[in-house]
Amino acid sequence: MSHQTGIQASEDVKEIFARARNGKYRLLKISIENEQLVVGSCSPPSDSWEQDYDPFVLPLLEDKQPCYVLFRLDSQNAQGYEWIFIAWSPDHSHVRQKMLYAATRATLKKEFGGGHIKDEVFGTVKEDVSLHGYRKYLLSQSSPAPLTAAEEELRQIKISEVQTDVSVDTKHQTLQGVAFPISRDAFQALEKLSKRQLNYVQLEIDIKNETIILANTENTELKDLPKRIPKDSARYHFFLYKHSHEGDYLESIVFIYSMPGYTCSIRERMLYSSCKSPLLDIVERQLQMDVIRKIEIDNGDELTADFLYDEVHPKQHAHKQSFAKPKGPAGKRGIRRLIRGPAEAEATTD
């Protein structure tokens, strides 16, 4: 599942897309600037698509900056001209840029019109998206030959089945996000929580330094929990939920991911969403913390006593009683037989 970023195309860009679909342009280069899709370059056709391809595409690709390229073929389908969609994400580009472009790819395809896109090509080096690379891609689609590294990465993006292998003090990039290192004091606070020495730990992402840091460990009762949820920024919360259930006293650790809607920047929303799973993986595997429930909320007002109880102990659906097998019609069951015991039979004879 890819995350949506909220980035959209302006009306000017949509007009350019419309002209492009009608065949005016051979190529469009699209970038993300100020949280909007912008057309950085557009070129009319010069020759056949094969002769235009490398001279048009390759000079536009920067070594450290992702972008999208839409390249028009000469063939048409029922909707019009067919296009190649190129997602350029060089190895040396910034992690946040890679994440942003990966998460916005589906939006761009929708804005342009997915029915016009014949092929998708993903590349980290220019050889992947050159004309030769595109032809290799077509060959791989028509045969079971092994995929190139870039093709395998695109396949993994599409099926969203990337496994993570992360540690506490390293930053690890995955196709679904980034596992930022956890600061020492944050990790120690989580250790104390797992030993029941704390009952609340709040973590935040230091976006500038790309680190998960400690924000709050104030002793927190259930009634005070809503007050701990910021209204203007995202946070991770680990709460020791002390309660009774069916006569038993329980202490359950609950993870709460609070994200106050679109008051946060796109980058902040993406980072918190991407770092969540690797953080929980560290907590559960390395600290052996048993996180009973994982909850996502927009604001603290949702955290009532009833809400938290129902999340930790969801109500079971009542078991439906199966219908008894109906009896057959009385007239077709034959003569009713009366079976008597031996004593009854002798009494009747006398």
UniProtKB/Swiss-Prot annotation:
One of its GO terms (cellular component) is cytoplasm. Residues 2-139, 175-313 form the ADF-H domain. Coiled coil: none annotated. The modification Phosphoserine is found at residues 143, 277. The modification N-acetylserine is found at residue 2. Phosphorylated on serine and threonine residues. The keyword Metal-binding does not apply. The modification Phosphothreonine is found at residue 349. Residues 316-350 are annotated as: Disordered. Keywords: Acetylation, Actin-binding, Cytoplasm, Cytoskeleton, Phosphoprotein, Repeat. The modification Phosphotyrosine is found at residue 309. The keyword Cytoplasm applies. SMART domains: ADF. It is found in: Cytoplasm; Cytoplasm, Cytoskeleton. GO terms for molecular function: actin binding; actin filament binding; actin monomer binding; ATP binding; phosphatidylinositol-4,5-bisphosphate binding; protein tyrosine kinase activity; protein-containing complex binding. InterPro entries: ADF-H, ADF-H/Gelsolin-like_dom_sf, Twinfilin. Pfam families: Cofilin_ADF. GO terms for biological process: actin filament depolymerization; barbed-end actin filament capping; conditioned place preference; negative regulation of actin filament polymerization; negative regulation of dendritic spine morphogenesis; positive regulation of cardiac muscle hypertrophy; positive regulation of neuron projection development; regulation of lamellipodium assembly. PANTHER family: TWINFILIN, TWINFILIN-1. Interacts with G-actin; ADP-actin form and capping protein (CP). May also be able to interact with TWF2 and phosphoinositides, PI(4,5)P2. When bound to PI(4,5)P2, it is down-regulated. Interacts with ACTG1. Actin-binding protein involved in motile and morphological processes. Inhibits actin polymerization, likely by sequestering G-actin. By capping the barbed ends of filaments, it also regulates motility. Seems to play an important role in clathrin-mediated endocytosis and distribution of endocytic organelles. Belongs to the actin-binding proteins ADF family. Twinfilin subfamily. This is Twinfilin-1. It comes from Rattus norvegicus.
